[in-house]
């Protein structure tokens, strides 16, 4: 690994070995002093949209990839309509198969008949790997979101027209251990834009 570039080595079976650098870097580099948000899971520059989040016992899950050592210091969301709610956000590591695994860090962000961007302290260092974001709200809300065209296509049912962009589970809170079953796929839907300020 060289500053986020992944060296891929392949053997073609005849004794010849090929090496190449994967130029995909996540999070992307920025200039010194840039404290704008990195949105985990946003794959290309685009205009953000909105998503309606069902409150209560529903948790939303979606993966993101880190290709270089990254330290998060702040987490943020943006409610686009006034609401009274507490939003819980968690980062989970993954199993060898890439499934959501253990909760690494979580934070709560509260709103009282208000909207807009709010932040919470979120001190977490991540090594290169696959991680999962989980988000739930105590009440129904509308949040700034990643449009479908800029989301990760996790799977595509029946090779149809809409790819899975996130999953849903029924939980009363963010669990310490991600569920091993009970996920429902959402296809062709925006994903909440969770912003991170990096150290």
Predicted stretch roles:
Residues 26-48:
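Glycan-recognition and processing domains
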Residues 129-131:
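A short tyrosine-centered beta-strand micro-motif
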Residues 136-199:
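Short, surface-exposed beta-strand/loop patches at domain edges
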